[in-house]
Each structure stands twice: as C-alpha cells, then as structure tokens.
A protein has these predicted regions:
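A generic secondary-structure signal
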Residues: 90-93, 188, 223
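Surface-exposed charged/polar residues within alpha-helices that form helix-capping/stabilizing sites
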Residues: 122, 187-188, 205
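Conserved acidic donor-binding segment of nucleotide-sugar-dependent glycosyltransferases
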Residues: 173-179, 189-193
C-alpha cells in the first residue's frame, strides 16, 4: 500500500505501507523537517484540474496592484496563521497608496480549497502581484498554485520542501525572507512592469508544464517503480 497524505496535521496515519508521501512534513518555525519514526517522502501541492481552464491574456492590463488573500492581525479567527496575518497587515499599512486587496474572498478553509470561487478567481485574474505566505507550522498551500494558474506574479516566503522541477527565484516567481525584503520585492516589480509580466508568464507556463495533478502522479509512480 502507498499513502499520499495531503493533510495539514503533522502526525502520520498508523498504517503499514511501502511508501509514505507527506505534504506537511516541515516544521516551518524551525526551518527543518520533522523527525518521524519511518521514512517519509515530501510531496507538494499542484495545479488542480479545475484551474487549468483559464485563458490568460497578457496584453490585458490588470487593475489590482497587490492582492493578499489572508486576514489581518485584527481579524484573527484561528491560531497558527500569525505569519500570514503579519504579511497581510504589512501590505495593508505600507501599500495603502496602491490599489490593493487584503482579506478573504469567497470561502476560506477546507471549503474554499475544494471549490473554485468566482470572486476569488476574478481577483486573481485582475492582480499584478499576489503575496502568499505559508502557515506558521508547515509548508504547502494551494494558493501558490492557484495564483500561478491565473498568471499573477507570485511573491512567497522561502521554502525548504524539495520539489521535482522547483520554481526558480526571479525566473518563475520571487521568494522573500522578511517583511523588509517583501516590501522591496513589491516596489521593484511594480516599478519594472515588463519584468513582472515576463516572470509571471514564466511561472504560469512552468506550473502548467511541470506541476499539474498528472505530474504529481508521475512522481509517485517513479518512486514506486511503475
């Protein structure tokens, strides 16, 4: 038996299996992998099939400069999302002179990840830059791939989860390691429109070439030798 575990929880299912693939295997706050009693193979999210149908018109101008689809600190409703709240509050405070969106659109949580919300998609397709941030205690979030599939430039915090065909900094997206670096990246790409558009397009095409559901299945099959 093969287990492919995409749950947020860090604990493993107590089952006897040949291979165990786990998404949330990183202890994000300490920048290391969790210690398990068995071999665990990290696996990442991907572009879900529902998100493959959007035609991206790169000649069309986007009217939202920056979007952050997280709650601010003042709107906290659950634990473990402090980093996201800090990022949302930072963008809301320091880029209020720009046309920005900060906050949840449609439904968040599991329901939001399982369904494609039309208002959310509309905001993505209108956004020049989308800032993403992993949860406090693990890595891996569908928003990264949802944003890539809509052709926005992604700014995301640095990750250590290994990936087949990884996204390269400033080629497919941009990584940040602090709020100061995030602010600098935002200012740079808003001032360099052509580079922003090209990087966003690279990320979109790369995601659809190497990070679809079928690609994750191929990665699993390669490990198990089929």
């Amino acid at each position: 038996m093969i287990v492919v575990d995409y749950s947020d929880q860090s604990n493993l299912f107590d089952v006897d299996c040949l291979h165990y693939f786990k998404r949330s295997s990183v202890l994000k706050g300490e920048g290391r992998f969790r210690n398990y009693s068995r071999e665990v193979r990290p696996i990442s999210y991907c572009v879900k099939n529902d998100w493959l149908d959007y035609d991206i018109d790169y000649a069309e101008e986007r009217d939202i400069d920056i979007s952050v689809f997280f709650r601010k600190e003042s709107e906290r409703n659950k634990r473990g999302m402090t980093n996201r709240e800090l990022v949302a509050s930072f963008v809301d405070e320091y880029f209020k002179h720009k046309n920005i969106h900060v906050g949840i659109v449609d439904t968040d949580g599991e329901a939001g990840r399982m369904n494609v919300g039309r208002e959310y998609v509309d905001k993505l397709l209108r956004s020049k830059i989308v800032v993403n941030c992993n949860p406090d205690d693990w890595e891996g979030d569908y928003r990264l791939f949802e944003t890539l599939s809509c052709g926005s430039l992604v700014l995301v915090d640095k990750m250590i989860t290994p990936a087949v065909n990884p996204f390269e900094h400033r080629k497919h997206l941009a990584y940040y390691d602090s709020l100061e670096e995030l602010g600098s990246q935002i200012e740079y790409y808003l001032d360099n429109d052509n580079e922003r558009k090209q990087t966003a397009r690279n990320g979109y095409e790369y995601a659809l070439k190497y990070h679809k559901t079928s690609d994750r299945i191929d990665e699993i099959l390669e490990v198990i030798g089929i």
